[in-house]
Every structure is written in C-alpha cells, then in structure tokens.
Swiss-Prot record:
GO terms for molecular function: metal ion binding; UDP-3-O-acyl-N-acetylglucosamine deacetylase activity. The keyword Protease does not apply. It comes from the Bacteria. Pathway: Glycolipid biosynthesis; lipid IV(A) biosynthesis; lipid IV(A) from (3R)-3-hydroxytetradecanoyl-[acyl-carrier-protein] and UDP-N-acetyl-alpha-D-glucosamine: step 2/6. Zn(2+) binds at residues 78, 235, 239. The keyword Lipid biosynthesis applies. It comes from Geotalea uraniireducens (strain Rf4) (Geobacter uraniireducens). Belongs to the LpxC family. This is UDP-3-O-acyl-N-acetylglucosamine deacetylase.
Amino acid sequence: MAFQQTLKNKVAFSGIGLHSGKEITLTLRPADAGNGIVFHRIDTTPPVSIEARTENVVSTRLSTTIGKNGAAVSTIEHLMAALFSCGIDNAHVDINGPEVPIMDGSAAPFVEGIRNAGSKSLSKSRKYLVVKKPVTIRDGDKRITVLPSRYYRISFDMHFNHPVINRQFRTMKFDRESFADDFSPARTFGFLAEIEALMAHGLALGASLENAVGIDDNGIVNPEGLRFTDEFVRHKILDSIGDFALAGVHLVGHVKACKSGHELNHKFITELLSRSDCWSLMELTPPENKTASFPISLPEMAWLEAC
C-alpha cells in the first residue's frame, strides 16, 4: 500500500502482565495519518502519552520498554510486530497498566484481533527507509548488519548452550501472510532456573506454561511441546520485527542478526537512523487515476534498482 493505514474499528485485549502478574487491558483505536503508534497510560493522573519511537526507549532488559514523563510501558515488542505486520501505521493504544499483556506469549492473538478490527487507508503516503549502504553494529560476539535489498528480509542466527536449542538459523522475506502463519504464533521462551531467579526479584510474576515455552535441563516442559521445531529462532525474528518497528518507517533492506536481543536491536536502529548517508527516505505517490488503496508490490520494489 502506498498510503498509511489505521484501524477501521476499536479492538481490546486483556490478559496478565508477564512481569507484574496483574490483569491489564489495552484498547487499540483508530488514529489520524502521521500520528504513528502512541501508547496512553490511562491509569496515571494525569494520563501520559508515549510515542512508540526509538528515542523513547528507556529499557531493554528482558523486553523493550518505552517511557516519558515518569510513565512507562514495557513488553511492547509483540504488539508492535503485530501492528506492523498488519500494515497499521497509526493507532492509539489505551492501556491501564505498565506493560502490554503477554497473552499466550506470541503475537498471534494481537494479529487475529487487529485483522478482525479491519484497516483503512488514510490520505498520507507511507514512508520507506531504503538501505543504500551496509550498516553494522557489534557487541562482543553479537552482531547486526543491514544490507541493501529490494525486500525487507531478516536472517537470524541464534546460539544457546543448551541441547534443546543449540544453534538455530532462519531467514524470512517479510510478507504479511507468512508472518501471521509462520512467525506470529512463535512464543517467548525461558529457562526455568532463570525464571525462578527473576521471580525471587519480583519479576516474571505472570510467567507460566500458558504464555511461554519453559525449558529445563531435560528439555521442553510444556506438555504440548513446540509449535514449530525452530520456534525459538522464529520468536527472535518476531521480537526483532517489533523492535525495528520503533523506527517509525518501513525498512527496505536485508537485516542479518547474530545472537542479538532487545538491547542490540535498539542500538542498531538508533545507529541506522543516525547514518542518513546510508539510506534514502522515500514516499510513494500513486498515479492520479488510482484510488488511495491501489495495490502496489511492497516491499518487493523493483523500482529500487533504479534509485
């Protein structure tokens, strides 16, 4: 689509917070063109609005947290990935607590709800950040590189010193249907010993086998097992899409990540946005005889080769 989109109708989600263990409700509402994704902490006095942008990230410990004026919202990455994958550029997110509900540990419930709410085109062009030169950021043996590409593609190489995970690699060319079917159901995961330690420090109070894949020394603890044989790396790609969505534009490039997490994802997007010599910001304007919803093959943009 050449034009920005928003929700056609409101949609609400309720569930427990992964870390607080408290019941939380959030409501997505339509927003005007150029608004972006804005969270509203409606439980604070006065309410605080926080734009879902890279510059508002205040923590990347365990999840991605945005904050402003003393208020914060954590664990936003699954919702951000769902909004991005459904083509929603603008939305108000009313939330009555400090974190997005974890739901089943994946982005699938959000994708389903957003799809049911529907979307509509707005009168403003969507912006695309088209990578022209490679950009790399490293932290020890962790690394993220983005290369020029006609597509938005993510390749992820993950390593864990555990026989259940070991090394997993997957690459995906971003496509809404592929994300919905093959990546959005992938759940967050954790090692039981680490989860118990977090609980002892007042974190992960809402974690359970209902919203995460549990791993112990012997293997997968969940009775139902995994949703995909490589569910772990699929979830890492899901998280990355959500974190990268905080750039506020649609990325056109091939991201290659190795052992990265929320912290490096944030550093990467911050670095990329600062390197304006390595990309071009483009808008698509449809021909005058086309409607606002005319189809265009994006991010598979053959015209990029001429840029």
